[in-house]
Amino acid sequence: MRVNAQHKNARISAQKARLVADLIRGKDVAQALNILAFSPKKGAELIKKVLESAIANAEHNNGADIDELKVVTIFVDKGPSLKRFQARAKGRGNRIEKQTCHINVTVGN
């Protein structure tokens, strides 16, 4: 049994979120939640919410036992960029791209 959860258009770059995702891949969910709780990175908070959602989905929809669940797969894909304008000197302007990503977590036993 495998259960998915995803967060689309998360306001963090995929590269930064992948650093946190690599920490919990293949671990059991209790250990993964503990790692994320003590990680100082912004991505840890976002991934923790998605992982908790996947655990709740498994418990509610399939009646799964939380103690037996593991993080089967976790991957972070690049999302659409938000294009913004930043004023510069002498009437010029630069484009600022604010990166987003899609976080996908699959838990199972």
UniProtKB/Swiss-Prot annotation:
Residue ranges of coiled coil: none
InterPro entries to which the protein is assigned, alphabetical: Ribosomal_uL22, Ribosomal_uL22_bac/chlpt-type, Ribosomal_uL22_bac/org-type, Ribosomal_uL22_CS, Ribosomal_uL22_sf
Designated name of the protein: Large ribosomal subunit protein uL22
Record note on quaternary structure: Part of the 50S ribosomal subunit.
Family named by the database record: Belongs to the universal ribosomal protein uL22 family.
Organism: Neisseria meningitidis serogroup B (strain ATCC BAA-335 / MC58)
Cited HAMAP family: Ribosomal_uL22_B
GO BP, sorted A to Z: translation
SUPFAM superfamilies reported in the protein's UniProt record: Ribosomal protein L22 (SSF54843)
Function, as annotated: This protein binds specifically to 23S rRNA; its binding is stimulated by other ribosomal proteins, e.g. L4, L17, and L20. It is important during the early stages of 50S assembly. It makes multiple contacts with different domains of the 23S rRNA in the assembled 50S subunit and ribosome. The globular domain of the protein is located near the polypeptide exit tunnel on the outside of the subunit, while an extended beta-hairpin is found that lines the wall of the exit tunnel in the center of the 70S ribosome.
GO cellular component, one term: cytosolic large ribosomal subunit
Keyword RNA-binding included in the entry's annotation: yes
Keyword Ribonucleoprotein: yes
Pfam families per UniProt: Ribosomal_L22 (PF00237)
Note from the entry: Present in outer membrane vesicle formulations which are used as vaccines in human.
GO MF annotation list: rRNA binding; structural constituent of ribosome
Sorted UniProt keywords: Ribonucleoprotein, Ribosomal protein, RNA-binding, rRNA-binding
